[in-house]
Regions:
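Domain-level signature for proteins that mediate thiol-based redox and metal-cofactor handling
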Residues: 2-131
Length: 131
C-alpha cells in the first residue's frame, strides 16, 4: 500500500497534488487480467515519484511467478495510461519481486513514448519516403 506522510503531502504544490490525483485515477483503471481487479485495489503500487513532468512507479505483482504475459501487460498499461495524463511527459516503471522483472522493466521502459515522437502524419503523402 502506498503511504504518504501528511506533512510531505501538505507541502506539495497544488499542481503536484492535482497531478497525483490524476495519476491514481489512471492507475485505478488498470486491471490485473488474471483477477479482474484494479491494481490500486490489490495494493500493487509501492511508490509513485513525481519530478517535474516525469513519473516513476514502483510496483510488485501478485506473485513472483505471476505469468510473465500478465506482468508485462500490467506494467505496459501503467506506462501507457500515465503517458495519457496531461502534465506527464515521461514514465518509468519498475516492477520488483518477479522472476522476469529485469526483462519486463527493460521492455516497458524502452517502449516508444508518443509524446517524444512528435506528431504523426495525417495523410499518406506526408509520410517520409526514407527514414
Amino acid at each position: 500500500m502506498v503511504i504518504y506522510s501528511i506533512n510531505v503531502f501538505a507541502v506539495m504544490s497544488q499542481d503536484i497534488k492535482l497531478l497525483r490525483v490524476k495519476i491514481f485515477d489512471e492507475l485505478s483503471k488498470i486491471v490485473d487480467p488474471e483477477i479482474n481487479t484494479s491494481i490500486v485495489e490489490l495494493e500493487l503500487i509501492d511508490e509513485v515519484d513525481i519530478s517535474d513532468s516525469n513519473v516513476k512507479v514502483d510496483l510488485h505483482l501478485t506473485s513472483p511467478f505471476c505469468p510473465a504475459v500478465f506482468g508485462f501487460k500490467i506494467c505496459q498499461d501503467v506506462h501507457d495510461y500515465l503517458l495519457r495524463v496531461d502534465g506527464v511527459n515521461d514514465v518509468k516503471v519498475n516492477v520488483s519481486n518477479h522472476f522476469m522483472a529485469e526483462q519486463i522493466n527493460n521492455q516497458v521502459n524502452n517502449s516508444p513514448n508518443p509524446k517524444k515522437l512528435g506528431e504523426l502524419p495525417k495523410k499518406l503523402d506526408e509520410v517520409p519516403k526514407k527514414l
